Amino acid sequence: MKLEQLMEGVPFTLVQGSLDTEIADIIYDSRKAAPGLLFVCIVGTQRDSHAFAADCAAKGVSALVIQHDIDLSAMPGVTVVKVENSRYAMALMSANLFGNPARQMTMIGVTGTKGKTTTTHMIKSVLEAAGRKVGMIGTNGIYYMGRHKDTANTTPESYELQKTFREFLDAGCDTALMEVSSQGLMMDRVAGVHYDIGVFTNLSPDHIGPGEHKTFEEYRSWKGQLFKRCDVGVVNIDDENTAALLEGHTCKLVTYGRDEKADYRETGYELLRTHDFLGVAFHVTGKDEMDVKVNMPGEFSVYNALAALAVGKVLGLPDAAIHDGLGKCVVKGRVELVPISKKFTILLDYAHNEVSTESLLTTLRAYKPHRLVVVFGCGGNRSKLRRYGMGEICAKMADFSILTEDNNRFEKVEDIIADIREGMNKGNPDAKFVEIPDRLDALHYAVDHAQEGDLIAVIGKGHETYRDREGVKTPFLERELLEEYAQQIGLE
């Protein structure tokens, strides 16, 4: 592609060279420099890649995009373009390179502090129940047409994002659904992408600190940018930050929640539990009337489901598809049931800190199990405060705990468990627990000692597929391991 085509829609100044320069691909990692490529110099939080421009020129790149002036004396044969913001420019250039695929699909973006992953999965399930072909991007990776790829960030860098959109389109997807993080918005990863629907789940202080957001107000402001880049905003009317977040919005609004003014309002829910189902049922009023059953527990599941329902309504999907999609939705590693016995209920969840653990156990306690049992550990080479906190919460809220490993990395599991034990003793000196350092043995123990009506939560790893010991990662898929053991012992 000619550089002139690549720069379409990007304000720039040609410093030297020609816009007729042929560009084979865009890079922003100087280690990938090679002839025919364009290197984008980015001013990052840790370093400024303008420092690598000369090295890239020496390796034969055809063009450079710069944000501030650099010494060009040693690179006379390289075309150089100057822009005001190289991250923003790279986003638009990447879209041009891949043929602006986002313009050819229905685009849905979901933002919020909590619930993004679950809500996107619910929306995907509803869309697919209606026959839509969906590509999804988020915390759990990239999914489309039966394929899965991991991603480093909730919202990938703009080049990878546009490349993924192209893959979605080429594979036959008609809809792209993604989690949109505040970092993704602030760092221009989604610049140039216009959404048909933007979804807001909720907001609480998070991602505030060095390299992230300076204040909660800044964090909220960046979240709100999504609603200046979409046609319809589907928003949680009950959240106290909704009004401030929507300041300056340019989209039409559709609301959900419990407030009487909500377009889609939940008017009471009940908890449902069997050995292979843990969820909620509720009635929706407002712009429409519908009874909904969701295969995920807790109050937040109601809100996430309302958001997905509202998206379905905005898109004009059949009620049957919305109902079926919500009823069948399962999120890997997020309160994921493993139905191996009719006697007890066992589930996997990614809860790996004090806040998420307390939230999960509060949700599960509401189902009034015979015993609430927790299998957990804490990661090595991480804050000890997390160990004390999780230990304290489990001691207070669980009837029985099984302390074990969780990615020890380069620490001894015995030392990690000792820290957890300290938190347990603080939370409840009479707490009942057992220490089983090997996680597989801990899973077997949980199954072997399960009682009728128990609810067993295996937490910390969730969707992870490995165990990290001494920096060596080996396969560890908890769902498969539990299913294999149940079959091995003839569990019913």
Predicted feature locations:
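ATP-dependent carboxylate-amine ligase
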Residues: 1-14, 35-38, 51, 250, ...
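Short glycine-rich anion-binding loops that position phosphate/pyrophosphate groups of nucleotides
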Residues: 44-46, 182-183, 204-207, 239-240, ...
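N-terminal leader/targeting and accessory segments in enzymes
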Residues: 1-92, 269-270, 293, 297-299, ...
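Structural beta-sheet core signal
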Residues: 136, 178, 198, 235, ...
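Short internal beta-strands
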Residues: 62-68, 233-237, 375-376, 399-406
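Acidic, Mg2+-coordinating active-site environments of NTP-dependent enzymes
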Residues: 9, 70-76, 171, 196-346, ...
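Non-catalytic positions within long, well-ordered alpha-helices that form the structural scaffold/packing
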Residues: 53-58, 169, 191, 365
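Phosphate-binding loop of NTP-binding sites
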Residues: 10, 89-237, 241-249, 306, ...
